[in-house]
Amino acid sequence: MERGYLTLFRVRGVPVRAHWTLPLGALLLSGGRFAPGLWVGVLLVVALHELGHALFVHRFGLVNLGLDLTGFGGRCRWAGHPSEVQRAAIAWGGVLAQLALLIPALGVALFLPMPRSPFLAELLEAFTRTNAILIAFNLIPIKPLDGAEAWPLFGHLRRQRARVKKWKQKLAPQTLREALDEADRKNLH
């Protein structure tokens, strides 16, 4: 154990670690009751969230250093120099991964009978209600939550679109002028 973390496994060389507070957080989340399906489900939701960040980190050519799971959430550790848009997209990666689980889980919850197994019922609760609550919580625009870096994505994209539009306007008259000159040359010859 290193600084309270135990390396569970590695994904492409990237360590996935659990902190000693993980069981404590699970117990608090379930209100002190024995709820192994909820515990496993929330662990999977948090792990999926962090993997979502890691996927975007990898996609942008940055370096994944590790995924840490604690009793109070998780953390994707990475290094590199992303653009503002990339940093915001990485922040959205966790929530997008959670949504990829939430949508089909809601379909199961809405259209299939409730599981008879307490473990499966708790697991479904973790994948739906608890997952939705964690998504909403993570999107609060306050550091260290993802919302602090995720929501600015729309402002970055709007500014980027305005810059592209400005360049198009500068280039369009020149392009039109060149096209007219070309047409005149063809008509004269």
Language-model features: where?
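Hydrophobic transmembrane alpha-helices and their immediate loop junctions
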Residues: 1-189
